[in-house]
Design a protein with these regions (language model features):
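Hydrophobic alpha-helical connector segments
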Residues: 75-121, 137-140, 144-147
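Short hydrophobic/aromatic patch on the recognition helix
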Residues: 46-55
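Amphipathic alpha-helical segments used for helix-helix packing
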Residues: 66, 96-121, 125, 156, ...
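Alpha-helical structural segments
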Residues: 18-25, 30, 60-76, 86-94, ...
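A structured, mid-to-C-terminal "fold-capping" secondary-structure block
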Residues: 170-233
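Hydrophobic alpha-helical bundle segments that form small-molecule/ligand-binding pockets
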Residues: 122-144, 148-178, 202, 224-227
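Basic, helix-initiating cap at the start of DNA-binding domains
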Residues: 1-39, 43, 56-63
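N-terminal intrinsically disordered/low-complexity leader segments
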Residues: 1-14, 81, 190-200, 232-233
Length: 233
């Protein structure tokens, strides 16, 4: 990655941070596909070629965008509580909120990622949350990876629902209403007793998406806690 400011040439009229902020604004509004060097030059009022004095190209910009968003995963003044469950729960909730604000980062979260300042800070902090539990380092990495995989998977489903709403104009309840005629035939057939129970008994608990996220996360943390080494092991 190129230095923050060019060593030679005219005085810069913008910074790498401004370029990154402009790219994030565009991606938040229109998606990652809208990012191009020409578009970013227009956004910040600069010539397209001048951008190459700060970044090597679009891939470089995307790396800067990701690192800037990852910075929001952790509050700048974060102090760990010493309660690994509470700390991981808070981290998972914050990561979910950040990804929902920047949906374009979701498909990039599970890919190979370049080392960068905020990624390193986030990883180090997450590992400190589970340090001292009697786990090997590989087990610590697996715990952190499992929690992040849960968050990413849950958020992907939320984003898919948001896209379905945008595409159809129907929210989930309106869409479900359209399924009623077929589901009535399912009930009448008597062939699917568990589906009948779902239709008659379900739908009351964990309707709120935030509640469902918290429920699944807590069950995941329960499973991790159950596998922790016990004193004297």
């Amino acid at each position: 990655m190129r230095p923050e400011q060019p060593a030679r040439g005219p005085r810069p009229t913008f910074s790498r941070a401004q370029l990154t902020e402009a790219a994030i604004r565009v991606a938040d509004a229109e998606g990652l596909a809208a990012i191009s060097m020409r578009r970013l030059a227009t956004e910040i009022g600069a010539g397209t070629m001048s951008l190459y004095r700060y970044v090597s190209g679009k891939d470089d910009v995307i790396e800067l965008m990701i690192d800037a968003v990852v910075a929001d995963y952790l509050p700048p003044d974060l102090v760990l509580s010493g309660d690994w469950r509470a700390d991981l729960r808070a981290l998972a909730g914050r990561v979910r909120e950040v990804i929902l604000r920047h949906p374009w980062i979701a498909p990039l979260s599970g890919t190979r990622q370049q080392a960068s300042p905020n990624r390193v800070r986030m990883l180090d902090t997450a590992l400190r949350m589970v340090d001292g539990l009697g786990l090997s380092f590989n087990e610590m990495l697996t715990v952190i990876g499992t929690v992040f995989a849960y968050v990413n998977g849950f958020v992907e489903s939320e984003l898919a629902e948001a896209e379905a709403l945008r595409r159809t104009g129907l929210d989930l309840m309106e869409w479900m209403t359209l399924q009623v005629p077929y589901l009535q035939s399912v009930v009448a057939s008597g062939r699917y007793p568990m589906v009948v129970r779902m239709l008659t008994e379900g739908g009351q608990d964990y309707v709120d998406v935030g509640d469902r996220f918290a429920y699944g996360l807590d069950r995941l943390l329960d499973g991790i806690a159950a596998r922790l080494p016990q004193a004297g092991d």
